Amino acid sequence: MSIHTRKITDACRDKDCVEDLRVYLTAGSQQTLDSAANVRVRSAQLLHTYIDVEPVAFDRNHYCIDITFYYRILADAVIGTCRPAALSGLAVFSKRAVLCGEDSRAHIFTSDTRIAEADGCILSSSNRPTAVVEVLDPMVLSSKVKDAESGTAESVTVQIPEAIRALFDEDLVTSGDHRRLYVTLGQFSIVRLERDVQLVVPMVEYAIPEKECCDSEGCCTEDPCEMFSRIPFPARQFTPTGCDRKKGTPCDQD
């Protein structure tokens, strides 16, 4: 029997430590930061990952994968009150990987290929591999607040898609701020290239499950106390976990 699926042509893993990543705060959070005495970052949440695949000019089998991660940063600001004020903002991190995606000269069209909007563009029919990125929410390693230097601007202006801006209740402040929040994040990710292939697999008879479904109330005919008696006593959970100072997580530096 012939099937159509994807095969992994190449893959890599990364352990990125992104230092001093600027956080673009919302308008309200920026006002709070300007008057805050101290700031502590609570968490970083991955919102979206943009992936672009382009062939390498000098090697037809390899492709350049540009990846941009968008994070929601949540922090607490101490402004002299008993309860800290919540801060929210966006951090952006970009990286690049080069992987082997194999070479294919065929052009692929499918029945769901449609002409796009009135700009005259059509969906691409080139047979490029598909990039897949698996990533965990990053760990916040440290944070700090720095004064924005007057009369200077960042060397690179960040491009924030409208769909990402819409995820925040207020506008994001990208310029004209007095103080800036920076974070250092640790992130684990896996990047791979996949390509469509046709495979021939041996066909066997349809597998019929041998296990019968439970039709009694609660789907359990066994005596609950008898089932509980076979569970081992969780002695490890009653033992306090010791502190290893050599492997402890570093405190946030403001």
Where would I find each of the regions flagged by the language model?
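Viral structural modules
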Residues: M1-D254
